[in-house]
Each structure stands twice: as C-alpha cells, then as structure tokens.
C-alpha cells in the first residue's frame, strides 16, 4: 500500500529535522570539547612561572605574553559558552518539534492503516 503524498512529505521533513538536530548536537559537542581544551591550557599557564608562553600561529610557534593569551582564551571561552547556550535552545526547540511531528505522523499513519 502506498503512502499518501502528504504523509511522505511530512516524513521527509521529519528526517530533515532529525539531520539538522544531529548537526546542532555535533557542533555543540565540538564547542564543549574546545572549551575544555582552552580551560586546560589556562590551568597549565597558571602553573607556569614564566611570563612568556608560545602560541601556535599558522604552523609556527610565536612567543606571547602569558596574560594576553589568558585574556584571549577567556574571551573565546565566553563566546563559545554563549554559542553553546544558543545551540542548546535550538536543540530543545527541535526536540519538541520532532516529538510533535512524530505524534502527528503516527496518527496520520494509523488513519491510513499503514502503521
């Protein structure tokens, strides 16, 4: 038995939304990993008594003032945390939309006796 076109369309939208959600979750996880890496770098800099650190820039190490690098890293961490919050809100909205779409699809499929 063939599925009606509107149900096929809803199913495609559902799958696209799932893919978008997966992308957002992956981006959020990448940012979280980068934050952990930057926080670990800041911890290591705190342990160092040197006022100079080395930062990778285009495949070479460049000497930099430790305080400047700490400030840069702190700003990046804060920026990434804001982005993570945004991704979390998007993730929550998409999860709700997926749940609603899933319920709608199940009802539609039951109505056509395909489920």
Curated annotation (Swiss-Prot):
Keyword Chaperone annotated: yes
Gene3D superfamilies named among the record's database cross-references: 1.10.287.370
Record's keyword terms, sorted: Chaperone, Cytoplasm
GO annotation terms (biological process): protein folding
A cellular component annotation (GO) from this entry: cytoplasm
InterPro entries assigned: PFD_beta-like, PfdB, Prefoldin
Molecular-function annotations in GO: unfolded protein binding
NCBIfam families: gimC_beta
UniProt family annotation: Belongs to the prefoldin subunit beta family.
The protein's assembly and partners: Heterohexamer of two alpha and four beta subunits.
Name this protein carries in UniProt: Prefoldin subunit beta
UniProt source species: Methanococcus aeolicus (strain ATCC BAA-1280 / DSM 17508 / OCM 812 / Nankai-3)
């Amino acid at each position: 038995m063939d599925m009606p076109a509107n149900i096929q369309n809803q199913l495609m939208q559902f799958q696209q939304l799932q893919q978008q959600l997966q992308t957002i979750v992956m981006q959020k996880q990448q940012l979280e990993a980068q934050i952990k890496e930057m926080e670990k770098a800041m911890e290591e800099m705190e342990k160092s008594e040197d006022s100079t650190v080395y930062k990778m820039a285009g495949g070479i190490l460049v000497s930099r003032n430790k305080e400047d690098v700490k400030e840069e890293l702190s700003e990046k961490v804060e920026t990434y945390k804001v982005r993570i919050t945004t991704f979390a809100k998007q993730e929550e909205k998409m999860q709700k939309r997926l749940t609603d779409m899933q319920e709608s699809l199940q009802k539609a499929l039951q109505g056509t006796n395909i489920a």
